[in-house]
Amino acid sequence: MYQNIFDSHAHYNGKEFADRDELLPRLFASGVCGIIDVASSMRSTRRTVELSARYGPVYSAIGVHPNEVKDMTDADYDTLRELARLPKVVAIGEIGFDFYWDASGRDTQREHFERQLILARELDLPVIIHSRDAAQETYDLLAKYRPRGVVHCYSGSAEMAQEILKLGMHIGFTGVVTFKNAKKAVKAAAAVPLDRLLIETDCPYMAPEPTRGVRCDSSMLVHTGGKLAEIKGVDLQDLFDRTRQNACELFGIEL
């Protein structure tokens, strides 16, 4: 059994995990040592802090996804600021741009991406970045504000990955890297040094091959990790050890 499996991006706070109280203990007993449970709305922000308060290996990222920011208020920022004082809140996220769905409008997305980047700087917290069909726009704001953090679920080019790395960011890979058509993600993973690499599920989404199409959970990181270990030319346990260390250093966690 593999140890030190750290899932740097999951959504166990969601309705898809009504069985979380049975599932999470099984995961912790099977090698999963830590999980960053990530919010996407104010509602899920509240749920994730409740979840991390109940489970020692679970930590929270709080913030509002670009598809949800159209309803954000000044009071929501006050709430985020207050919740960020909790000891198990370790990041602001997920925040960023989503030009694929574009549910909030691009100007509104930019406004709240910037406001949440400023909030993270004020709180001295790393950020978890969502970027879909907005690589250059995301890079431009990261270059402007220079946060610590991770661009999660990366599937962009190796060239853009190198530019993001120059800003001091980490890059996270999901089960997408196992897909047969994921040539860009594979090339990008090859370009990311081990000390900047994070591994994640984005569960319940993004189940890797050979489990694609079912609800994802952190146990499936053995498949994603196996592919990343193959790409990087390292032993799978060594990859888990290194990505655990990376996550703990980035998010200020002592395990």
Which functions belong to the PLM regions below?
Residues M1-L255:
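Mid-domain alpha/beta scaffold segments of enzyme catalytic cores
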